[in-house]
Amino acid sequence: MATESTAAAAIAAELVSADKIEDAPAPSTSADKMESLDVDSEAKKLLGLGQKHLVMGDIPAAVNAFQEAASLLGKKYGETANECGEAFFFYGKSLLELARMENGVLGNALEGVHVEEEEGEKTEDESLVENNDNVDEEAREELREQVYDAMGEKEAKKAEGKSLTKPETDKEQESEVEKGGREDMDISEPEEKLQETVEPTSKQLTESSEEAKEAAIPGLNEDEVASGKTEQESLCTEKGKSISGAYVQNKEFRETVEEGEEIISLEKKPKETSEDQPIRAAEKQGTLMKVVEIEAEIDPQVKSADVGGEEPKDQVATSESELGKAVLMELSGQDVEASPVVAAEAGAEVSEKPGQEITVIPNNGPVVGQSTVGDQTPSEPQTSAERLTETKDGSSVEEVKAELVPEQEEAMLPVEESEAAGDGVETKVAQKATEKAPEDKFKIAANEETPERDEQMKEGEETEGSEEEDRENDKAEETPNESVLEKKSLQENEEEEIGNLELAWDMLDLAKIIFKRQETKEAQLYAAQAHLKLGEVSVESENYIQAVEEFQACLSLQEQYLEAHDRLLAETHYQLGLAYGYNSQYDEAVAQFGKSIDVIEKRMAVLHEQMKEAEGSFTEYEKEIEELKELLPEIREKIEDAKESQRSGNVAELALKATLVESSTSGFTPSGAGASVSMIASRKPTDGASSSNCVTDISHLVRKKRKPEEESPRKDDAKKAKQEPEVNGGSGDAVSSGKEVSENMEAEAENQAESQTAEGTVESAATIKSTAC
């Protein structure tokens, strides 16, 4: 039994707990109720705040408040719910006021600007600046002293600057002089380098070189030359060195620099004649001439050895090859520029000395000198001299360029081929000239390239000009795009402005639908106000027909639920009169303005009755009566304006009709008069004789006579037909055809003259008949 009782107690406890759980509210539903209460209260607060801002004139703040309230209620109840109608109505009303404020041209642009604060800031800024009137004499004297001290310091600084600038100019002059000296040093550097390289070895060979020189100048004795040659070879064999012709040439080069005055004159002549060549190139040409003379002095030694027969030909060839290689090595190490004209001068000088072999570089290549010492004939000395004189006289360089071409081609030949062909020492001079010829070739090519560069520069400028034009065209193409963007931005701004009206229309239309769905008086009156505001939106968007419809709908609803003396009716009549006036319906406008005045007068009468019945204060009634009295003159002015515009409109219509009638009559009367005259003229000849018909026919022909302009192309064709056989060598048929054309033209002219005379006679006969009738 105890167990059963405990089980029953447990079951009862479970049932009680279950009932308690069912009675307890769910936490989610309670939270929803709290949220709903918060949303409604918040929406009411926002609506009150928005109406306050709307009354105070803070339209943007009112729009924000109504927008937030509408969004809260729309999220909770849905956009078409009855609870959202009021929020949507006030939101649309505030948007309408905002659109009016944005579109209003005569609005207060300085609204919200604190002018007094700006004036106070200006006074504060002015107070910071010292006034001259408030400054004492002592302060003025102190200021003067400070100014004078500052001026003196500036003058002292200027003087120091001038003194500093003078030594700087002196330093610049010295630096320029040093630069000039450095350039001279640069010019003389190759010669000094040659002397330094020659000094250690040339002292050992002074005796042999002097003997070789003495043998070359008087008569080139074969025995002395041979002995000098053997001494040179003995020295070379003792020291274990091969003879280097470059060392001998460098030694004799230094001696010729000390003795040769003619060479100096030859160095100066190219400087005088060729102004376009730089100074350094001229001096280097002089150095090459010296080397050529040294070779000319050394050549007889080698040739005399060949004549004497004391040495075999193989040794002579080896010595020649060694000399050629040494000269090539020395010349390749030096930066010497030579011209073929200078080489020709050197060849001419060598030919003047007796007993020496002439080495001339002709146009077609180097000429191998003859081994005989007696009779020696130059290959082309006159051509080289002519080239020299032409260049000295300042003639054109084109001939020299033409002569340089084969010499430059010879530079491509290797040295070994010239030695194998037995060119000997003469090839060394050609090799030296041809080795330096590529540099001249570069110079000549540069001179030839100058016009090409000029043309390229011109083409580049043209291309740049075309690029600039393309850029300008691109800019011109871009500018329309920019203008399109600007137009789009303006359109967007306009859309934003129109967007406020559109949004206001949408909100008010939604509020109208919500209120019309309800059958209460308050909802219907809100629907009437929605129609009124929709009409105002239509007026702002200049859709006056729609505005009239909306105002009439509003008026119909108000007449159902409002008394005849209500001020809302007066407002609706007034707005409807404005819409009619904007739509040029002045009669209806005057009628609506009159109805508005009637409503106001009824309201004033009702207020006076209420004042009599009331026992308390009459301030409220008196205040409203004064407001209504102030409205009456404005409405009456609107009536007068409508009547005047109606009169002016009628006058304008009459004037427009008159102008239209005049234009129509002026367009048709001349043609009618002409038709009547033509009919009269046509009837009279029919009543008369048949000859009048002939007269009319002749006049018809006279009007269509040919003009001289039609004859000119035919005459031109006839002239062309006459000229073609003469120029192209055609047959006489074309000439005959041209004559036939001219004869036809003359015959036509005669026929025209006869027809004109016949017409004149017929016309005179017609006039006589008409006078007789």
Swiss-Prot record:
This is Nuclear autoantigenic sperm protein. One of its GO terms (cellular component) is nucleus. The modification Phosphoserine is found at residues 127, 175, 188, 242, 304, 319, 384, 395-396, 466, 483, 489, 648, 691-692, 712, 731, 737, 742. Residues 198-207, 369-386 have a biased composition (Polar residues). It is found in: Cytoplasm; Nucleus. A motif (Nuclear localization signal) lies at residues 702-708. There is a cross-link at K722 (Glycyl lysine isopeptide (Lys-Gly) (interchain with G-Cter in SUMO1)).
